[in-house]
Amino acid sequence: MSYVTSNDEQKVEIVNIASLEGRVKERMEAQGNKGAFGYIRGGAEDEWTMRENTASFNTKTISPRVLRGIDSANLSTNIFGIKLKTPIIQAPVAAQGLAHMEGEVDTAKAMEEVGSLFSISTYGSTSVEDAAAAVNGAPQFFQLYMSKDDQFNQFLLEKAVKSGVKAIILTADSTLGGYREEDVINHFQFPLPMPNLAAFSGSDGVGKGVFEIYAEAKQGLVLSDIQKIKNWTNLPVIVKGIQDPVDAMEAIAAGADGIWVSNHGGRQLDGGPASFTVLPRIAQVVNKRVPIIFDSGVRRGEHVFKALASGADLVAIGRPVLYGLNLGGKEGVKSVFEHLNKELSITMQLAGAKDIEAIKDTDLL
């Protein structure tokens, strides 16, 4: 199965992040990659939750402060002692080779250059070792889709630890694939190998659909899996896919070192609440005991600001990364982050928040 996609390496002119989707759709469909674009863009069932993720940011307004002597904005922050130049990070996204020939390698390089954080998926088009080798010791996280086979889990995690990752992301909201009609219509099957899978079993995922890939995942995840991963790796474990305050409390009690508030960009359960809707309640019960990462629906610097003001410590983006990757490779991904950083900086100064801590003290109405 041959697959050819973008190999462009260039800065991308961006007016707003949402406009990138149409540009990428046109390019990928012209290349005969309609199914791949549908996989990247699509959401579950009626895509209500996917749309609500972005729309929900308009349910809150920023209460700006003035006359505070703020002539610049400081975006720097940190997590687990890792210093970052921006609170915006890349969400782990599978199969980035669908968007660009260099896939995760270009994304990892971009994250290093903008001072952000790269996370690689179990289902990446690049191995965890190759992604780590692409950068000069820049911090990376590994996203684990836990398998039914603990030998496979330990094998993968050992690879990740040897590659120098700084934390493990346990994906809790994706024990099977959401019903995405676009994938069904396009008869989408993965055209590129997934090296992390192939290294253990020889089965690289080529020619398989989403449901076949997820069939090997552990459907019956339990809280004790958190400690199991910590014992295997001696690394912090972030639980990704938390949408309920009780789950957040139970995950922390079970040893979680971080909470990732996410509904997988509306790709899994349709009809569930927007991530931004549930964030304040989760932040309240977490009460700063562990860091909170937030994603789903972020398309503006204003959205980043509102998520931080609602209790998030970092804000992740998924689809926009792949759109930038398709349009310009490493430089395209950098363009996405530079644009969002610019919007966030403007919002901060106009709202009267000089740094990330000041954003957290800002009232939303």
Task: Please identify what each model-predicted range represents.
Residues S2-G81, R180, F188-L221, E357-I359:
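An N-cap/entry alpha-helix motif that binds or orients negatively charged groups
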Residues N53, G271-Q284, L325-S345:
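C-terminal helical cap(s) of enzyme catalytic domains, especially alpha/beta-barrels
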